[in-house]
Amino acid sequence: EQSDHDIRIKAHVNQIGDVEAPEVSFEEMCEHAEDNEVRCGHPETAARMRELIDEYQEAGDSIGGSIAFEVRGVPRGLGAPRFDSFPSRLGQAMFSIPATTHVEFGLGADARTVTGSERNEDWTFDEGDNPETESEAGDPVPVGNDHGGLQGGITTGQPIWGEATWHAPTSIPKEQRTADWETGEIVEDAQVIGRHDPVLPPR
């Protein structure tokens, strides 16, 4: 999607269960994500995801998954170092979506193996020829973007990228064991009747 401020947002389903798509570019997400039911930017993986979803649906069960997202055109300098940081505000919005269990920016959890010197990344001066960034020629910019366009809670002008994960829908037709609050008895064959989504990320 594109806003009035030329901010471009795109996401695609990058994993369903144990079926994971290879990394795809922003352009590939734009080109392929809406071409299939699961909204995966990698067509071959999308077909495998569809098969897996069908398996769980036929069994009356469900499965979790995740999306990869990228935002371009966000001006640098938005956010704050602490309570009003850009990632905390964006994370709050994403965690407001039911069933969200994990949100990460840049390297995310992989940052646990990165040293402080690596995390700092090298800096240089923008030559003014990179359409992906919102900086101008002569501006100081990081050479890489492992931090996901965010440093110290503030936007850098580079693409903001990361992932969000949703657990499997828990309202499923498969019979399960539960406890009846009113009778105080164990129910061995509880079943949820109604419409059931076998997976959430494509939505």
Residue ranges: model-predicted function:
Residues 1-82:
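Glycine-rich, mobile lid/loop segments that gate access to catalytic sites or pores
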Residues 182-202:
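Amphipathic, heptad-repeat alpha-helical segments used for oligomerization and assembly
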Residues 59-187:
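Glycine-rich anion/phosphate-binding loop at the beta-strand->alpha-helix junction
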Residues 15-24, 116-118, 184-189:
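Short, mixed-charge aromatic SLiMs
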Residues 1, 202-203:
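Well-ordered alpha/beta subsegment
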Residues 16, 168-169, 193:
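Structured, active/binding-site neighborhoods that engage oxygen-rich ligands
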